[in-house]
């Protein structure tokens, strides 16, 4: 990862990679033997020095040998240590690492790792060869992305907001939570703060600039973050403002098509979205529920496979509620999830609770509801699986990780606090629970300031099944997975063998309906991976 601030200074990140070998730099050791016997001042010291060297060198030799053994032993449990890697992949990896090191050396001795993603995004896009390579990398699955912020919002503004009858709520009260909210009405609402967007556009001198302001209002770009609580309120507020667009029937399917296109172009073959329960609407006021959405998505996946000639492409849906909801609401949602799971078993896969963990109810608060759902699940062919957000917090006393594991969660969303729980890490490894790391999200939402210190690196070095996801990329002003992979490549010193294993991890922890679907996904990814290796060798061998 690198950064250049407005041509003032350059930044370099020094990458230490000990994966394919160990380089030991030993300082010259000078031993000065002082002879206290005045009668021996003129004695030839060569034999004395030779004797000292023979005494010390065996120690150094043994030390270096033990050191190399220790480092190699630790490397054996790190990500990628057992990943198959042939000679051609090694050739591509050498090229990849040379490019990475050259990019680092082209910048000054300042460190970018603590800089916010918003500041460096344009530099990454314009100046990094490594980023271009990662864009071409087949990434497997994106396992943690929220449906209503899964693809960039430019589609909502450039297409959705130009549809007839689009209104925006505008008031001079900056504290009004509804300010900037979009919605479609068949006629002018009684509340005069709702303004017809087409009329507003007719009155502005620069429509392109106006639309850019609308788009910026749906991201965290340029906002005064304030403290952690204020940041989360601004973050949540965007979901409220955009809801009237993403749930409007003429836009809903198009937005998901936009997601599919962005992910496929970025090398993603399998997507799993968290979809909060809520209805869709049309201009007549007719309501379309989550059953409609799941069925519509199954149809859209079929057309997408044909459009892109990708028989392996898949979408899975995880139903969810905000963790601020009461027990009754959560129970009803889980009952619906159980029904959806059995009506659409190849698409609807489970349930989660979302939202800031430090402000909403902990998982233990809903233990009676979980117990009832477990009992109810015996009446169905498919029980309800869980994919809990847990450990997305900076507080020491958060208990959600304990309950997520005890409730047999299939994966853990974020898991930032997991390295503080050695026993839980052992259980995650033993039970093969996938961990969904969302690095850019974690930085922007102030869980991690310096990407090099991201706790995911500890999990990765322990050999836990880490996967990489974008979380809410639309609000963070990007699409796909390449930016997250890029951030970690620079900050964690990842090589191609490790990137390969991250992609494999994502496939292994995907919700494939059966072995046939898994084989289809993995085999298609593997073909793309070796094409990617050829691309690196053919394109960058002479650099």
Swiss-Prot record:
Q: Which residues are glycosylated?
A: 126, 179, 309, 326, 397, 508, 514
GO cellular-component terms in the record?
extracellular space
Which amino acids does the record list as binding Zn(2+)? 144, 146, 389, 471
Protein location: Secreted
Asked if Zinc is a keyword of the record, the answer is yes
**Known catalysed reaction(s)?**
adenosine + H2O + H(+) = inosine + NH4(+)
> How are cofactors bound according to the entry's free-text note?
Binds 1 zinc ion per subunit.
Q: Where does substrate bind?
A: 232-239, 355, 472
Q: Which cofactor does it need?
A: Zn(2+)
> Where in this protein does the record put region Disordered?
31-58
Note the superkingdom of the native organism: Eukaryota
Name one process (GO BP) from the record: adenosine catabolic process
Signal sequence extent: 1-26
Q: Which UniProt keywords apply?
A: Glycoprotein, Hydrolase, Metal-binding, Secreted, Signal, Zinc
Q: Where is the composition biased (Low complexity)?
A: 31-54
Tell me where it mainly resides.
secreted
Is the Ribonucleoprotein keyword given for this protein? no
The Enzyme Commission number assigned here is 3.5.4.4
State what this protein does.
Answer: Adenosine deaminase that may contribute to the degradation of extracellular adenosine, a signaling molecule that controls a variety of cellular responses. May play a role in the regulation of cell proliferation.
Q: Which NCBIfam families match?
A: adm_rel
Concerning its family, UniProt says: Belongs to the metallo-dependent hydrolases superfamily. Adenosine and AMP deaminases family. ADGF subfamily.
Q: What is this protein called?
A: Adenosine deaminase 2
Source organism (scientific name): Dictyostelium discoideum (Social amoeba)
Q: Which gene encodes it?
A: ADA2
């Amino acid at each position: 990862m690198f950064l250049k601030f407005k041509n003032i200074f350059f930044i370099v990140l020094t990458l230490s990679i000990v994966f394919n070998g160990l380089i030991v730099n030993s300082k010259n050791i000078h031993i000065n033997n002082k002879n206290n016997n005045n009668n021996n001042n003129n004695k030839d010291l060569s034999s004395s020095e030779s004797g000292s060297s023979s005494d010390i060198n065996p120690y150094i030799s043994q030390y270096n040998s033990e050191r190399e053994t220790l480092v190699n032993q630790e490397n054996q449990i790190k990500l990628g240590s057992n990943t198959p890697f042939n000679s051609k992949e090694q050739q591509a990896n050498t090229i990849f690492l040379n490019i990475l090191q050259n990019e680092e050396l082209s910048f000054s001795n300042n460190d970018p790792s603590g800089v916010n993603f918003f500041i460096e995004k344009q530099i990454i896009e314009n100046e990094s060869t490594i980023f271009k390579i990662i864009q071409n990398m087949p990434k497997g699955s994106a396992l943690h992305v929220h449906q209503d912020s899964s693809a960039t919002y430019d589609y909502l503004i450039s297409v959705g907001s130009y549809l007839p009858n689009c209104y925006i709520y505008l008031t001079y009260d900056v504290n009004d939570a509804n300010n900037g909210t979009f919605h479609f009405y068949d006629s002018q609402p009684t509340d005069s703060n709702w303004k017809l967007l087409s009329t507003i556009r007719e009155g502005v001198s620069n429509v392109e600039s106006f639309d850019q302001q609308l788009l910026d209002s749906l991201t965290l770009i340029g906002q005064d973050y304030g403290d952690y609580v204020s940041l989360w309120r601004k973050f949540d507020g965007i979901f409220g403002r955009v809801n009237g667009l993403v749930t409007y029937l003429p836009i809903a399917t198009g937005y998901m098509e936009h997601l599919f296109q962005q992910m496929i172009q970025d090398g993603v073959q399998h997507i799993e979205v968290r979809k909060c329960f809520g209805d869709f609407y049309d201009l007549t006021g007719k309501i379309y529920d989550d059953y409609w959405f799941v069925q519509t998505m199954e149809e859209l996946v079929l057309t997408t496979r044909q459009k892109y000639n990708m028989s392996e492409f898949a979408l899975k849906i995880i139903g969810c509620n905000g963790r601020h909801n009461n027990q009754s609401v959560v129970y009803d949602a889980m009952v619906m999830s159980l029904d959806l799971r059995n009506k659409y078993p190849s698409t609807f896969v489970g349930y989660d609770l979302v939202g800031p963990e430090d402000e909403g109810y902990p998982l233990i608060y809903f233990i009676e509801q979980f117990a009832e759902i477990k009992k109810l699940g015996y009446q169905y062919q498919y029980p309800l699986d869980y994919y809990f957000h847990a450990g997305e917090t900076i507080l020491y006393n958060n208990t959600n990780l304990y309950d997520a594991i005890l409730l047999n969660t299939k994966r853990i969303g974020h898991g930032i606090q997991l390295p503080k729980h050695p026993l839980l890490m052992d259980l995650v490894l033993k039970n093969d629970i996938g961990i969904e790391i969302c690095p850019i999200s974690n930085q922007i939402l102030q869980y991690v300031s310096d990407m090099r210190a991201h706790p995911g690196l500890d999990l990765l070095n322990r050999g836990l099944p880490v996967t990489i996801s974008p979380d809410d990329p639309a609000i963070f002003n990007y699409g796909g997975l390449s930016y997250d992979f890029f951030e970690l490549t620079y900050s964690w010193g990842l090589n191609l063998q490790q990137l390969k294993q991250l992609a494999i991890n994502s496939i292994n922890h995907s919700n494939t309906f059966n072995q046939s679907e898994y084989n289809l996904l993995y085999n298609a990814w593997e073909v793309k991976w070796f094409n990617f290796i050829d691309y690196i060798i053919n394109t960058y061998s002479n650099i």
